Amino acid sequence: MVTLYSSPSTHSSGPVASYSNSSIGLYNYHHNKQIAVSSILSRKFGSLQINQKPFWNAVRMQDGAVATPPSKIENETPLKKLKNGILPVAPPKEQKDTIDFDSNKAKSTVSITVVGASGDLAKKKIFPALFALYYEGCLPEHFTIFGYARSKMTDAELRNMVSKTLTCRIDKRENCGEKMEQFLERCFYHSGQYDSLENFAELDKKLKEHEAGRFSNRLFYLSIPPNIFINAVRCASLSASSAHGWTRVIVEKPFGRDSESSAALTRSLKQYLNEDQIFRIDHYLGKELVENLSVLRFSNLIFEPLWSRQCIRNVQFIFSEDFGTEGRGGYFDHYGIIRDIMQNHLLQILALFAMETPVSLDAEDIRNEKVKVLRSMRPLQLDDVIIGQYKCHTKGDVTYPGYTDDKTVPKDSLTPTFAAAALFIDNARWDGVPFLMKAGKALHTRSAEIRVQFRHVPGNLYNKNFGSDLDQATNELVIRVQPNEAIYLKINNKVPGLGMRLDRSNLNLLYSARYSKEIPDAYERLLLDAIEGERRLFIRSDELDAAWSLFTPVLKELEDKKIVPEYYPYGSRGPIGAHYLAARYKVRWGDLV
């Protein structure tokens, strides 16, 4: 009897690639299609011919790390071992020619390239987040940051631009100026076109100069419009990817406009990158209260038994901004509020909220459960959608412009700046429970929150104390994502004194009162996760497909039928149609009660 041993494959965030000194073990592990083991056994160890055609240059490991060849080994050595009944594969520590990534970790470097470095997102979010990570000591010892854009700029000019947006944490001001100087010294700039292989090759040369022979890993953050980032991915992959370490690319939304364009975008990305190299970022998944959602649910016994249709009457996901498009009208008009907020931010939060308990906290296990939820949802129907658009409004001496007053927006635009929708999950846990979404611009307040309204108490002894309006007795769990992060539970309580008078009180966890430490920005968490290879908060391609399949039909119907949005004044609570939509399912919007 012959026993073949081989080391298990390694799937870690780092570029670990271990190979046997045995040619047979190597081919059996990485190229088993080239060796028919069964035919070898059937010949009872007759003459053994091994095709040793090199294939190392074609082998690219997870995250783009390139496999390196083992030392040349004569055929008779593994053959003798095979005839003796065992074919061992040496463990990594015994392989002299394999790169020891653990020992090289201290010698490795991370090069971070912000593509589109002169844009608002880079200046306001990405560079400040990178500085915050540096300030907290979260970045690797050896790192370099490069800005890349078409604008002509020197290193000094980039540093001056970036320095204007950097701030130190409120709770840690020590050595702020010194830390800024140290950080800015690591920042450099290279000007080039996004579709130029030559310009990216020049960037690669500069990166290698700063990497100084260290084991290099590279992260590209694409802070550029989606119509040009495929060219940037192609050039970065072909001209500036890491030779031996990992190469990762962060891609900003929007990920297409519908199912078809999103799928085409994914196909284009996968011409140059593996799925493991693509980090589709949705910064709302990096919000503290969103990340805490699974902790709240799965580590507290009082919530998990209630987390189903038996106890929950409806769930509301509410997003509101107190300002209009203001400078982004041209971009926004191409997408609208449903694509900009609902299809990504709110739907991702819904998937985290409604998913089943994952097998583990591993990224793939969590994302598998999210995909199951999305695939269980009914495609959104036009009757379950209300759209609106804000109009000019004068308050006192101040006049606020309407959406179409923006010079970059067509005067006859029907693009919604507000939308409300009712969605349903057809599975055993959530059957019949309405999941309501509401998102809008130029509303009366800025907030993002999750509201869980529980069912009425059957046979409630105190119903008479609430009169005919039983909604006043509804228990409600509120998770306020922004601003002033908080979790509070609305309960019914007796008012102190004689008699029996009830009111609703809040059991309140206000983060600013409970925790003295400032909450990190979402971009800090997501950038750190990308550097460490943690994919839990990033969107997988099948998640994206499932999400678009829910919204694409209704988006097409809205545009084909040229549905006119309901107009609402700038600074108001939104169109009245949203109330009628909620009332159809016997629900009141919790933020308007």
Swiss-Prot record:
GO cellular component: chloroplast
Top-level enzyme category: oxidoreductase
Active-site residues, Swiss-Prot/TrEMBL: H345
GO molecular function: glucose-6-phosphate dehydrogenase activity; NADP binding
EC numbers on record: 1.1.1.49
Pathway membership, UniProt: Carbohydrate degradation; pentose phosphate pathway; D-ribulose 5-phosphate from D-glucose 6-phosphate (oxidative stage): step 1/3
Keyword Calcium carried by entry: no
HAMAP family: G6PD
Protein name per UniProt: Glucose-6-phosphate 1-dehydrogenase, chloroplastic
PROSITE patterns: G6P_DEHYDROGENASE (PS00069)
Disulfide linkage: C168-C176
UniProt-annotated binding residues for NADP(+) 1: G116, A117, S118, G119, D120, L121, A122, K123, R150, K253
Protein's job: Catalyzes the rate-limiting step of the oxidative pentose-phosphate pathway, which represents a route for the dissimilation of carbohydrates besides glycolysis. The main function of this enzyme is to provide reducing power (NADPH) and pentose phosphates for fatty acid and nucleic acid synthesis which are involved in membrane synthesis and cell division.
Subunit annotation: Homodimer.
Keyword Oxidoreductase appears in the UniProt entry: yes
Principal subcellular localisation of the protein: plastid
Highest taxon above the source species: Eukaryota
InterPro entries (UniProt xref): G6P_DH, G6P_DH_AS, G6P_DH_C, G6P_DH_NAD-bd, NAD(P)-bd_dom_sf
Gene3D superfamilies listed in its UniProt record: Dihydrodipicolinate Reductase, domain 2, NAD(P)-binding Rossmann-like Domain
Family as reported in the entry's similarity comment: Belongs to the glucose-6-phosphate dehydrogenase family.
Keywords from the named record: Carbohydrate metabolism, Chloroplast, Disulfide bond, Glucose metabolism, NADP, Oxidoreductase, Plastid, Transit peptide
PANTHER family per the UniProt record, alphabetical: GLUCOSE-6-PHOSPHATE 1-DEHYDROGENASE 2, CHLOROPLASTIC (PTHR23429:SF11), GLUCOSE-6-PHOSPHATE 1-DEHYDROGENASE G6PD (PTHR23429)
Substrates-to-products reaction catalysed: D-glucose 6-phosphate + NADP(+) = 6-phospho-D-glucono-1,5-lactone + NADPH + H(+)
